[in-house]
Amino acid sequence: MAESMKGLKRTHRCAELSAANVGEKVTIMGWVQKNRNKGGLVFVDVRDRSGIIQVVFEEGKSEAALIEKAAKLRAEYVVAIVGTVAKRSGAVNDHLATGEIEVLPEELRILSESETPPFHIEENSKTKEEVRLKYRYLDLRRPDLQRNLIMRSKVATLTRQFLAEEGFLEIETPVLIKSTPEGARDYLVPSRIQQGQFYALPQSPQLFKQLLMCSGYGRYFQIAKCFRDEDLRADRQPEFTQIDMELSFVDVDDVIEVNERLLAKLFKEVLGVEVSLPIQRMTWQEAMDRFGSDKPDIRFGMELTNVTDVVKDCEFVVFKNAIENGGTVRGINAKGQGGMARKKIDKLVDFAKDYGAKGLAYIAIHEDGTVKSSFAKFMTDDEMKALIEAMGGENGDLLLFAADKNKVVWDTLGALRLELARQMELLDKNEYKFLWVTEFPLLEWSEEQNRFTAMHHPFTMPMEEDLQYIDSDPGRVRAKAYDIVLNGNEIGGGSVRIFDQDIQSKMFKVLGFTEEQAQEQFGFLLTAFKYGVPPHAGLAYGLDRLVMLMAKQDSIRDVIAFPKVKDASDLMTEAPGHVDAKQLEELGIAVVAKEEKKDDAE
């Protein structure tokens, strides 16, 4: 039966104790990590979120009843122990912060017993993630997950402190909002009072933070919960957290400057890492041309080389056709990989096909200078020599080429570059390389929808010098948009916003909105623009992804207390679940089963 902690008050967390506390009487409380009974001598490791301390029950130093009680302790029992801190009688444990000391107890209370847990609570558990997520409250006891959440809390606290000192106001925006179909799917919430109508959960506080600028608040921030009904992957969740901000009377440089100082503070105070300022900047066009990605990992080289002009007159039909169809030929140089086995090269070809490429052409330069190529017979010796020279090829190098439309070539070689970096172990997790990517295209063409869509969102300001093309050549227009990239991951993005009614109307028109549709969906914002709008800009970080990278984790699930899995379900609470028919009736909702598509043969 559980004992009361009445009369006891915890004096220290377990790992707060040190050699400086020797001789002090202390009260510790926590979970039993391990219990070792050596007959008349019982060692109990007690754990809380700060760490572990060893408690020693020994004949001659502890009462027999106390030793007997300690021998019955099991893993995850919750205990309170009163005792004296002493130097360890045995060997020092260098693996523990408290490894020099132990506690000699005079009182033990069992506050709560535990059944045998489904897995051992330990660092870097090898237990299947599905099991750990089902018992997440146990999983969260593990020291590595606790460190991640402690780090997350510290990042949030430091962010609040920094932004408050910079004159930002923390203002909450609504969670029940109007649905706008542009972009990813909304989560919808039915209204009981206004049946047949729905709220949406926000994908970001975008419109409200712009309205706060219209309202004269100047500098806003919020650590905001956001929601997106989309297919999940390692770095996405249906509900996620943003560090969101907006500033008035600023331009691109102002937003970048304050955020560079924020990042420098976070990395210095949380990780002890100095961020060199100013952070490097690169236009979207340069990033795509050099790295095949708008979020390039610049911890390593292996940049793309455009060899279109070098091979434009060759007879290799793959290169020839791509160039004639308005495409390009580009390559990457995998240094030292010239001896790669053909089977591995074939796997790289298959990898490339996943990104839309029809294949990969290659030149393998062996250490002895001999050249093996998939297309040598279609090239003259001089053409081959010129191509190798253009690629910076040396003995021992593997040159890989893609030829197609720009997007296919960029996507293929950008992904291949990262895959080779992983295989060649070029990625250092202890290195943090930041990059600003700027001047994104304002719009991108959607083949599926047969229209332009906003690359960021419909409220992004075009660059002044490109405004002249918004009607005649919208695909040419660049945006005053910027993303902050860390080690090949976009951790934040923002833009200068449109604050001119005419430009906003043109933007809606290019996106295919009629005046009525624009008014229906964004009328409140357009009306606000009639009453004096300051120039404004903002940025939002994905807090989950930022902490994931700072904590050197591979999934954001490891930095979120209660995450969802890939089908957007919660294995612990079994959400989503069915609801009572009466609740649906109150909402005026009937659930209709999806009809299965009939086989054509039927």
Q: Where in the sequence are the language-model features?
A:
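Class II aminoacyl-tRNA synthetase catalytic cores and aaRS-like
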Residues: 1-602
